[in-house]
């Protein structure tokens, strides 16, 4: 994938606009120098997230575990229902919620308050994994 004209689509879900903005600012325009630029699609409702995932075209998903309905439940639903589901970064508020993130089958987890470097590095790793394992289009 050429980074000159390619774009990575990142879905960000939270019912809190401030959380969505923090995620967007942490990742920035390009999560790492070796990766394409990021394009964000932001949603505050579960229905909109599932509709977007059904349409496809998302490379990485960032879900707020504290949103209503919870991002961890949405993660589990996406992993169960979406063919070739993109990797998911779950945001949890409490360390003790780690077991829920495991149950949800999230690919990575970060805690709140958000550490911008941790978010960007984790998203970059998920994107690299997605690129490396992407199914070829015939």
What are these model-predicted stretches?
Residues 7-28, 61:
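Conserved acidic segment of CheY-like receiver
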Residues 22, 114-123:
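C-terminal output helix
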Residues 31-40:
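A generic structural motif
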Residues 42-60:
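Acidic, metal-coordinating helix/loop segments flanking the phosphotransfer/catalytic sites
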Residues 59-81:
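Conserved phosphotransfer microenvironments
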Residues 89-91:
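Hydrophobic/aromatic residues positioned on beta-strands within the core alpha/beta folds
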Residues 93-110:
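Alpha4 helix (beta4-alpha4-beta5 surface) of REC/receiver domains from two-component response regulators
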Residues 124-138:
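The C-terminal output helix
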């Amino acid at each position: 994938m050429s980074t000159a004209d390619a774009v990575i689509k990142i879905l960000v879900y939270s019912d809190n606009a401030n959380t969505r903005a923090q995620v967007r600012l942490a990742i920035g325009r390009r999560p790492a120098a070796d990766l394409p630029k990021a394009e964000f699609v932001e949603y505050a409702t579960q229905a909109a997230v599932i509709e977007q995932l059904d349409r496809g075209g998302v490379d990485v998903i960032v879900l707020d575990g504290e949103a209503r309905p919870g991002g961890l439940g949405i993660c589990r639903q996406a992993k169960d229902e979406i063919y070739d589901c993109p990797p998911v970064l779950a945001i949890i508020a409490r360390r003790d919620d780690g077991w829920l993130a495991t149950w949800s089958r999230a690919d990575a987890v970060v805690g709140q308050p958000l550490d911008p470097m941790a978010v960007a590095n984790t998203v970059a790793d998920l994107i690299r994994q997605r690129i490396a394992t992407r199914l070829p289009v015939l």
